[in-house]
Regions:
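Conserved NAD(P)H cofactor-binding loop of Rossmann-fold oxidoreductase domains
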Residues: 78-84, 235
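A glycine/serine/threonine-rich, flexible loop-to-helix segment
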Residues: 44, 162, 175-199, 239-243
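Substrate-binding pocket helix/loop in short-chain dehydrogenase/reductase
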Residues: 86-87, 94-99, 191, 195
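Alpha-helical segment proximal to the catalytic Tyr-Lys
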Residues: 115, 158-162, 223
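Conserved glycine-rich cofactor-binding loop
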Residues: 13-14
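Catalytic loop of short-chain dehydrogenase/reductase
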Residues: 126-148, 153-162, 174
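Short C-terminal tail/terminal secondary-structure segment
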Residues: 215, 226-243
Length: 243
């Protein structure tokens, strides 16, 4: 039944996260969105919880509160930040903040959700990483902490497969209409045409492109796919991208 499908999405208030929430709602899920700010969407079936996921203690508390209220069996950790800096300017605080956001939050949320997933012998976990794990200048803390998601997914896939739980990664390339992309490349930037020309499919991605990949991984029919990384990047993972 529709009411029995519960998903948690981090960073669900805008961009890729909002597109993922919309897709899940259309598929009949009750969706809990964890974000720093509310979307204001007011969609039926959407439950919004405001939390700073870079705050490890607040994240753990929010995770346990959500899991006590909702039987979450689908978890999508999408929230992220970049902190673009050359190597000389990267601080340990930058590294710790993005480690908390990208990796510690994933761990806290997964540990909180695991009892329900194991009890139901079903779970779908998607970690939203980035094409930048293959290397991109001035992304030291972003690339390294997002790359850690691939290690989490492969390890958890081995540990949890016998419990009916799959864990996969979606790694987007340049996605328009997202704060993270346009923080680096404004919509009126003269660099934009050059970036598009460097993408094999000759366009930027859209949030819906990523949501469709997530939709595949969370399907009950995807139970034989786990520990995998799907690049949703217009082909830049097999070539390069110019910023």
């Amino acid at each position: 039944m529709m009411s029995e499908k519960y998903a948690l999405v981090t960073g669900g208030s805008s961009g890729i996260g909002a597109a993922i929430c919309k897709s899940l709602l259309e598929d009949g899920y009750q969706v809990v969105s964890l974000s720093r700010r509310a979307s204001g969407a007011g969609s039926h079936g959407l439950h919004e919880v405001q939390v700073d996921l870079a705050d490890a203690l607040a994240t753990r508390e929010a995770a346990h509160e959500v899991m006590s209220r909702f039987p979450i069996t689908t978890l999508i950790h999408n929230a992220g930040a970049i902190r673009e800096k050359p190597l000389e300017e990267v601080s340990l605080e930058d590294l710790q903040a993005l480690t908390n956001l990208h990796l510690s939050a994933a761990l806290s949320l997964m540990q909180a959700a695991l009892p329900t997933m194991k009890q139901k012998h079903f779970g779908r976990v998607v970690l939203v990483s980035t094409r930048a794990v293959l290397g991109l200048a001035n992304r030291t803390v972003y690339s390294s902490t997002k790359a850690g998601m691939l290690g989490l997914a492969r390890t958890w896939a081995l540990e949890l497969g016998a419990h009916g739980i799959t864990v996969n990664v979606v790694a987007p390339g340049p996605i328009e209409a997202t704060e993270m992309f346009h923080e680096i490349i404004p919509v009126d930037s003269p660099k934009l045409p050059r970036i598009v020309d460097s993408i094999p499919v000759k366009r930027l991605g859209r949030p819906e492109d990523v949501a469709r990949a997530v939709r595949f991984f969370v399907s009950p029919d995807a139970g034989f796919v786990t520990g995998q990384t799907l690049f949703v990047c217009g082909g830049t993972s097999v070539g390069s991208i110019v910023y």
